[in-house]
Amino acid sequence: ITDIKVEIVKEVKIDGTRVDNVVVGETYTLPSGDKAAIYGYYCDGVMYKQGEEVTVNDEIDFTSVKDITVTLANGAGIRTQDSAGMRFQASITADDTTMTVINKQDAITEGMLITAYNLYTGTGDHTLDLKSTYTTLNVENGVKGGWYAGKEGTYCGSIVNIQKENYIRKFMARAYVEIKYSDNTEEVIYSDVSNEPRTVRQVAKAYIADSNSNY
């Protein structure tokens, strides 16, 4: 009698389109190269890199994560809700499928780095990123942060409870999007560094002038 081996096959999809049938327990290799999604592929809360091997235990539908751009708005604004302070605003631009992944707020998150201008210029190489060793405020938008004013992809980071002696101190910011992969590595996409450092006094004066113009 010949043993009969039954193999269970599961369908693998990318963006809803079948790309392969894989035996349960075996691996599927994600696309790589020029035709692959730039930042990899997402499934069930996990981001995978191009060319990564993924063990198939059930049907899988990966979402392509393509171009992501984050742009910092010029200048700064006054934060008036809750604790008062200085607010910087950024916006994320991405295709629809990538934006669905960003909206899940698990493997891809966003934030704002804020620091004093004199600390930034004192580095010598004028660098502001997540690895900066000088005093920097990292404001993560987070799951509960939502989008600013209900506009998808727009978020803010604020510095609050600023001491009076710092009202004339210039502050600046840089926005970022962070992708956390299954292999515990990260890729960070940054905006340009703000080219218009602002003091609390400057922003407050502009806010008052703008408010008065509405009467």
Model regions and ranges:
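Secondary-structure capping and domain/repeat boundary segments
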Residues: 1-70
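Short, surface-exposed linear motifs at loops/turns and structural transition points
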Residues: 67-215
